[in-house]
């Protein structure tokens, strides 16, 4: 399944996660929205359960998690719970496509912050639909621990998984399995039933094709722009369609 295409995404993601990781604010907002959109009980709300697992893995205190669930359920009102999911699109230096998912309680503030982050590095925030056609959304589950390929294939067949890819240790190790968005919860349950250890479950935008970046200055500007975008509390995820060599990735850092 197009190894280099996926490797590029994982390298960029690993770098950003290692540098910053998601803040408590970002993770709590994801819990609030998940609890509001479904029932505020993780046992019956897959999106909420996944958001809570991510928060716990990042060390978010239990009281913060409980408070976020209560905010989403409407039992803890503080005037800060009215978040909506937004998707923004734009272009980085050299015309690279950038897709951003955000949770915001103020669209104007978020758009202004994003516009500033883009323009500072020679990019620009675009109109809705300008680059989203270049990406597809997939369910992604990362498995760790003992992994037998034959058993994995059986589970993927049963759970309607689409593909899988082994990860290098520098990318966290294990294997990532991919599914259609509407099959993610089912595949997650099937993998659990087969005894696999699940490290992470998420929806992820993946580029259909990538742009090779060969200029060090452009690579540095792109990585700095993505770092700035990721650092905004309103931002939940940033996906792009550029690809760097390992040498350029090191220079960009």
UniProtKB/Swiss-Prot annotation:
Specify the superkingdom.
Bacteria
In terms of InterPro entries, this protein maps to: Integrase-like_N (IPR017856), TACO1_YebC-like_2nd/3rd_dom (IPR048300), TACO1_YebC_N (IPR049083), Transcrip_reg_TACO1-like (IPR002876), Transcrip_reg_TACO1-like_dom3 (IPR026564), YebC-like (IPR029072)
TM regions (residue ranges): none
Q: Which UniProt keywords apply?
A: Cytoplasm, DNA-binding, Transcription, Transcription regulation
Query: GO cellular-component terms in the record?
Result: cytosol
Keyword Transcription included in the entry's annotation: yes
Pfam families with a match to the protein in the record: TACO1_YebC_N, Transcrip_reg
Can you supply a Gene Ontology BP term from the record? regulation of DNA-templated transcription
Q: Where is this region: Disordered?
A: 1-22
Subcellular location(s) per record: Cytoplasm
Question: Gene3D superfamilies, from UniProt?
Answer: 1.10.10.200, 3.30.70.980
Q: Name one GO molecular function term.
A: DNA binding
Family, per entry: Belongs to the TACO1 family.
Please give the NCBIfam families that the UniProt record associates with this protein: PRK00110.1, PRK12378.1, YebC/PmpR family DNA-binding transcriptional regulator
According to UniProt, the name of this protein is Probable transcriptional regulatory protein slr0989
């Amino acid at each position: 399944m197009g190894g280099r295409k996926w490797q590029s995404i994982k390298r960029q993601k690993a770098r950003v996660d290692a540098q910053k990781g998601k803040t408590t604010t970002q993770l709590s907002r994801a819990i609030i929205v998940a609890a509001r959109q479904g029932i505020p009980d993780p046992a019956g709300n897959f999106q909420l359960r996944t958001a809570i697992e991510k928060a716990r893995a990042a060390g978010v205190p239990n009281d913060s998690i409980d408070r976020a669930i209560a905010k989403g359920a409407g039992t803890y009102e503080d005037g800060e719970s009215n978040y909506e999911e937004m998707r923004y699109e734009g272009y980085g230096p050299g015309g690279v496509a950038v897709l951003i998912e955000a949770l915001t309680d103020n669209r104007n503030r978020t758009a202004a912050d994003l516009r500033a982050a883009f323009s500072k590095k020679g990019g620009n925030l675009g109109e809705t639909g300008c680059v989203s056609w270049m990406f597809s959304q997939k369910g992604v589950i990362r498995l760790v621990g003992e992994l037998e390929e034959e058993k994995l294939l059986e589970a993927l067949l049963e759970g309607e998984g689409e593909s899988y890819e082994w990860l290098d240790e520098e990318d966290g190790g294990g294997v990532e399995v991919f599914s259609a968005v509407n099959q993610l919860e089912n595949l997650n349950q099937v993998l659990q039933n087969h005894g696999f250890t699940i490290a992470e479950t998420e929806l992820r935008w993946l580029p259909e094709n990538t742009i090779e970046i060969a200029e060090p200055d452009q690579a540095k500007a792109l990585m700095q722009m993505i770092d700035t975008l990721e650092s905004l509390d309103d931002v939940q995820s940033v996906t792009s369609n550029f690809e760097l060599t390992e040498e350029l990735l090191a220079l960009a850092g």
